[in-house]
UniProtKB/Swiss-Prot annotation:
Signal peptide positions on this chain: none
The UniProt record lists the keyword Ribosomal protein: yes
Protein name: Large ribosomal subunit protein bL32
Pfam families recorded: Ribosomal_L32p (PF01783)
HAMAP family, sorted: Ribosomal_bL32
One cellular component (GO) term of this entry: large ribosomal subunit
Organism: Malacoplasma penetrans (strain HF-2) (Mycoplasma penetrans)
Keywords from the UniProt entry: Ribonucleoprotein, Ribosomal protein
GO MF: structural constituent of ribosome
Lineage: Bacteria, Bacillati, Mycoplasmatota, Mycoplasmoidales, Mycoplasmoidaceae
GO biological process: translation
UniProt superkingdom: Bacteria
């Protein structure tokens, strides 16, 4: 079974995981009501997408 030959330092461990960070989601203002929404999604507050009313689907 493989065994580490040397201790992995904190800085080396941190460098390896540096790209695993969370990114801040992109937010844009809704053209209808001005609330912040993610792009290409229906607005939760007014229900519009590209200035068109999206019908509510009941599940």
């Amino acid at each position: 079974m493989a065994v580490p030959q040397r201790k992995v330092t904190h800085s080396r461990k941190a460098k390896r995981g540096s790209h695993l960070h969370l990114s801040i989601p992109t937010l844009v203002a809704c053209k209808r009501c001005g609330k912040k929404i993610t792009p290409h999604r229906v607005c939760n507050s007014c229900g519009y997408y590209k200035n068109k009313k999206v019908p509510q689907i009941e599940a």
